[in-house]
């Protein structure tokens, strides 16, 4: 932590020395946060240092370390063909897994035509990432209630063991592993939904965010969602 008039990167070397010593002592490298009160940056050791909206909560950090210990390589994944059996669906899923695993990326874009099975592709991808220990909590965003309802129904049918909730309809069910919402509803929930520890939808709450449509107008209007969640 530095004063507001100081660039938080000034403390980077000092923080890394602390992290090195803690790793030597406890056998696990801690997450580094750099801040001056306005800008906050995070170095989790898995990805390049990046800007975040706030500190991770204790629960976020525990989940991060638990997932890291359970994570399996995505190099040789088996796609559930009962969910996504078309060759291009399997190819899309493997391409995303390669981007996340081998190329160490944090974002992926799938461009698929109407009727090509986008939702099934995403469901099969979620199953792969869950089975390989890469994710725990999922957020599915769409710009209309009907699309949210339709997507949730598909997830329930194809992944019946995954707990799900639709924030547009279920106002008191926030503990599900897979959350479905419109952009506007999620904007409201970020600030208003709390549990006994405070804000529920913290910066690191979701491990995977799926956008039903990724066009520029959506991003420009709801940019805050994507800059808030890490």
Q: What is the predicted role of each segment?
A:
Residues 1-137, 142, 146-162, 174-178, ...:
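ATP-dependent helicase/translocase motor core
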Residues 164-172:
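Short acidic low-complexity segments
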Residues 171, 178-179, 217:
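Extracellular/periplasmic ectodomains of large secreted or surface enzymes and adhesion receptors
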Residues 187-190, 218:
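Activation segment
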Residues 197-230:
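SF2 helicase catalytic motif II
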């Amino acid at each position: 932590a530095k004063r507001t008039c100081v660039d938080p990167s000034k403390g980077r070397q000092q923080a890394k020395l602390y992290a090195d010593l803690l790793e030597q002592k406890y056998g696990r490298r801690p997450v580094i946060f750099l801040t001056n009160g306005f800008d906050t940056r995070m170095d989790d050791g898995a990805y390049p240092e990046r800007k975040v909206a706030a500190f991770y909560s204790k629960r976020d950090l525990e989940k991060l370390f638990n997932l890291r210990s359970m994570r399996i390589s995505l190099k040789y994944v088996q796609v559930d063909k009962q969910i996504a059996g078309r060759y291009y669906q399997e190819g899309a899923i493997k391409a995303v897994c390669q981007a996340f695993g081998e190329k160490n990326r944090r974002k992926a874009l799938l461009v698929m035509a109407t009727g090509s099975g986008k939702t099934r592709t995403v469901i099969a991808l979620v199953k792969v990432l869950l089975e390989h220990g890469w994710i725990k909590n999922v957020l599915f965003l769409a710009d209309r209630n009907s699309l949210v309802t339709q997507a949730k129904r598909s997830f329930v049918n194809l992944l019946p063991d995954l707990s799900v909730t639709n924030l547009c309809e279920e106002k008191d069910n926030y503990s599900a592993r897979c959350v479905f919402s419109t952009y506007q509803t999620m904007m409201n929930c970020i600030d208003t939904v709390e549990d006994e520890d405070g804000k529920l939808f913290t910066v690191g709450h979701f491990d995977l965010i799926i956008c039903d449509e990724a066009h520029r107008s959506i991003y420009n209007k709801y940019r805050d969602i994507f800059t808030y969640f890490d």
